[in-house]
């Protein structure tokens, strides 16, 4: 088994490379002597930087090229941010490992202000996420929310250049890049419900590659997997992509799961929220039931309005 070289398909952004190196190190620590190589590549989401993500349209903006590399044999595994992973996979591929989750929260980042509540009326806040935008606008309709694209370094540069008074980024991404000092205050799930799978790293591979799947098995984190599968089951039932105003967050206490979710209109005028508590063994069923509840409360109409501009296919 150890004469095999594992090739990791990864995006070229600093954060994606951090995640790929993390998986590389975990594999080599669990299997001394195993050779693991990175295969960096560029995705559609990396190329189109002058258009809001929601307007680019489509699921899997950051993963399709990596999946092609798996299918044609250029790579053995692909490493993703779980929040970027679509609910559907090409035939023959699947999500086989979810690593231990890091901090799932969003971060308020500013050079002048310490918290969202401290921002004066009319302040400009940058984020490319419809999920963040709808929650920001609901909480602070007096703010000007503008789109913000690019990798973490690019976004911070735009803040430092004075284009924005504050920006919202993922806590986990800043920590992984050694930029934790830029966080002025984390936003609790009550303030801003995270994206599905936020803070977790997922590994995709060919489902018939039993050798690679066996090598990956020790990297799977059971608690994280249960939480993320509940969140993803809800997202699947809502037919949500990664660029839709959907938030979901599951917490596990022993065998008891608490799942929260929301669907909002991008302008923040409509927000549908719900939650479920139940046994962890029913994580995916709870996700589906919570999605049904949200759809019945008006989430279907909100999402249809969003998809009319950007189909989720």
From Swiss-Prot:
Cofactor binding, note field: Binds 1 dipyrromethane group covalently.
Keyword Calcium in annotation: no
Pathway annotation: Porphyrin-containing compound metabolism; protoporphyrin-IX biosynthesis; coproporphyrinogen-III from 5-aminolevulinate: step 2/4
Family: Belongs to the HMBS family.
Protein known as: Porphobilinogen deaminase
One cellular-component annotation, GO: cytoplasm
Pfam families named among the record's database cross-references: Porphobil_deam, Porphobil_deamC
Keyword entries, A-Z: Porphyrin biosynthesis, Transferase
GO MF entry, a single one: hydroxymethylbilane synthase activity
Comment field (misc): The porphobilinogen subunits are added to the dipyrromethane group.
InterPro entries membership: HemC, Porphobilin_deaminase_cofac_BS, Porphobilin_deaminase_N, Porphobilinogen_deaminase_C, Porphobilinogen_deaminase_C_sf
Top EC class, one word: transferase
Reaction it catalyzes: 4 porphobilinogen + H2O = hydroxymethylbilane + 4 NH4(+)
Keyword Transferase annotated: yes
Needed co-factor(s): dipyrromethane
Residues that bear S-(dipyrrolylmethanemethyl)cysteine: 242
Lineage: Bacteria, Pseudomonadati, Pseudomonadota, Gammaproteobacteria, Enterobacterales
Binding partners and assembly: Monomer.
Transmembrane spans: none
EC number(s) recorded for this UniProt protein: 2.5.1.61
Any one GO biological process: protoporphyrinogen IX biosynthetic process
Role played: Tetrapolymerization of the monopyrrole PBG into the hydroxymethylbilane pre-uroporphyrinogen in several discrete steps.
